[in-house]
Swiss-Prot record:
Its main location: virion. It comes from Enterobacteria phage SP. Homodimer. The capsid protein dimer binds to the viral RNA via an operator hairpin, but also many other RNA sequences in the viral genome. This is Capsid protein. Belongs to the Leviviricetes capsid protein family. One of its GO terms (biological process) is regulation of translation. It is found in: Virion.
Length: 132
């Protein structure tokens, strides 16, 4: 089990020149969802990441790893009060059988990272262009 620690994401953004530091906010004791967010004065404007690992159950035979990202955008014109004008979300769900190996899980993780860096996926996300 990994300890919930501060996470720093570097080389992010369109030009790869941004850094984001996420601070642990705790683990929900009911559902085991770990929460991290950008330290900010207004909670609604914080960038958030949640991570959870669900164990197999009677109805579901696989482990389910869920990662969610939320990036709110704040109003910055005309000295408005802090408010969220829009948000971008990402929701990634990975599913593994209890028999999967750490090698297989690492392969999926690294394939996903490489896929997100591929020009086809970059164009789809950044420019909202569908594949043809």
């Amino acid at each position: 089990m990994a300890k919930l620690n501060q996470v720093t994401l570097s080389k992010i953004g369109k030009n790869g020149d941004q850094t984001l530091t996420l601070t642990p906010r705790g683990v929900n004791p009911t559902n085991g969802v770990a929460s991290l967010s950008e330290a900010g004065a207004v909670p609604a404007l914080e960038k958030r990441v949640t991570v959870s690992v669900a164990q197999p159950s009677r109805n579901r035979k696989n482990f389910k790893v869920q990662i969610k990202l939320q990036n709110p955008t704040a109003c910055t014109r005309d000295a408005c009060d802090p408010s969220v004008t829009r948000s971008a979300f990402a929701d990634v769900t990975l599913s593994f059988t209890s028999y999967s190996t750490d090698e297989e899980r690492a392969l999926i993780r690294t394939e996903l990272a490489a896929l997100l860096a591929d020009p086809l996926i970059v164009d789809a996300i950044d420019n909202l262009n569908p594949a043809y």
